[in-house]
Amino acid sequence: PNLPKLHFEPEQPITTPVVKEVYGLEAANVMLGWRLPGANDKSTDISDIVGSILYNGQAGLIDLDLNQQQKVLSAYGYASTQPDYSSFLVAGRPKTGQSLDEVRDLLLAEVAKLRDGDFDENLIEATINNYKMQLMRSFEENDSRAILYVYSFISGADWADEVARIDRMSKITKQDIVDWANKYLGPESYAIVYKREGKDPNEQKIAAPKITPIVTNRDSQSEFLSEIQTSQVQPIEPVFVDYKKDMSQFEAQKGVNVLYKKNETNDIFTLIYVFNTGTENDPALNLAFDYLSYLGTDKMSAEQIASEMYAIACSFGLSAGANQSWIEVSGLSENMGKAMEIVEGLIAGAQPNEEILQNLKGDMIKSRADAKLNQSRCFGALQRYMIYGSDFIRRTTLTDPALQGLTSEQLLAKIGDLMGKQHEVLYYGPQDEAEVKAALAAHHKLAADLQPLEKKFSTLQPTDENKVMLAQYDAKQLYYMQYSNRGEKFDLAADPQITLYNEYFGGGMNTIVFQEMREARGLAYSAWANLAIPTNAKGDYYYMAFIATQNDKMQKAIEAFDEIINNMPESEKAF
């Protein structure tokens, strides 16, 4: 109650586009933004709906007109609320041979449709239904419940207004949206930032400041911490999962085992088909899944599928890992049957489209080239090479010529073949077992004799000798990782000690590694270390230590890291 209120000088209206450029090694992209009133303004309800009408990952204007039509490499948009001024942002990445100005014009054309009312009015109701579902899903977690209080506090909103938001949104009309868009999303009232590849011609050098190490005070406690620690609270009694009592299993048909857990919290369902095969078995699986998402059937176009799924507040996705693949359908439980019918119909009856496939191949090759310009992506590829070895990379990666040689028939056959394999079904939702079994029988049509798939796991590389692996990247900072695998197998009895060690030593911002490397010595932007627990009973433990730091601090950072790893600082209070 004694906190000062936020006061700020109002900004001058933007009457002509504000144009800025930034340069760097990463791939080119463009972002545009319009200034909106602060989070407490009554129009904020409209801005969030407009953001989802423009882009929602399924059936928004950008989704269907740009991404689904493959007119850009990728594009998105959203409203971002802040206490003083909020913003409405749209952004995109260019295809091969496409200029940033062309991407800009495509984005501006989609925003213009909001001003002109050139969108389906049904999107408003669908957006509100999806917003309700997202709230229900988020409220399954205490973090999300708490953060709503935090955002309300930060924006200075009355809590009664916060909880009545859905009621207000349900009264918003298409004309309200058109009026709002004309008021705030003017054709000239935006700022635009071009991210271009290359060296900044106006780059300015800043002298590196001298950093004086500080003595950590992890054994000291503030009055605030002491007050919290001495407060009386009701002890939390842990509840451990009993897989025989807390969930159930049944067989939908031979070769299809269902793991079932009833959702007692809300009306949201999640249904996942899990196949024990992935990119180690077939590196083209992800391309096949991506291709399918652009296709329609003889009854529904791809746009109709996306719009219908969004209208019933459901979604679906297909993805492949190294050793497992997933087909997931989720959303409002009352619409599960309809969603399953749409997804299963697409899987069984997708109509090939060679133009889409050629565009998809070109976009994948462009995305690969862009990834090579990104330091984090390059470092991630180096990590996989270090941990899994060159054979793993070859098995799980399509070369560009192999990618170009794949046909529609081959890709769709891969998905069809997958549905002829044994798999698990995971269900979490409000329906009872009998209803789930009936839904699977009605919509999950499979052959009577499914082929078995053996469960496999990726093999980690042992570290029999010291090696250094380097990926050159011309940047002012570096990413450094140590990896050690002595072949020690999973031991259930050691699990508590390992978890405790990781929490104390290197698992977060309040650990020895972060405090010593960043806070005390100023030698890293980020640092962590842990003993990784295997993901399967036959897997190996392996040790990993990571530093992100400036190039000129590398030697000192590595030496300090080795010192605290080999001679771990001890603090009884921190422990």
Region annotations inferred by a language model:
Residues 73-75, 174, 183, 247-251:
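Proteostasis/folding factors centered on peptidyl-prolyl cis-trans isomerases
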Residues 172-182, 408, 442:
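Charged, well-ordered internal alpha-helical segments
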Residues 403-406, 411:
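Alpha-helical scaffold elements lining the catalytic groove of polysaccharide deacetylases
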Residues 27-38, 63-170, 191-195, 203-205, ...:
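M16 family metallopeptidases and their MPP-like homologs
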Residues 176-195:
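Bilobed periplasmic-binding protein-like "clamshell/Venus-flytrap" ligand-binding domains
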Residues 1-65, 77, 104, 193-308, ...:
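His/Glu-rich zincin catalytic helix
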Residues 172-175, 349-358, 406:
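Peptidyl-prolyl cis-trans isomerase
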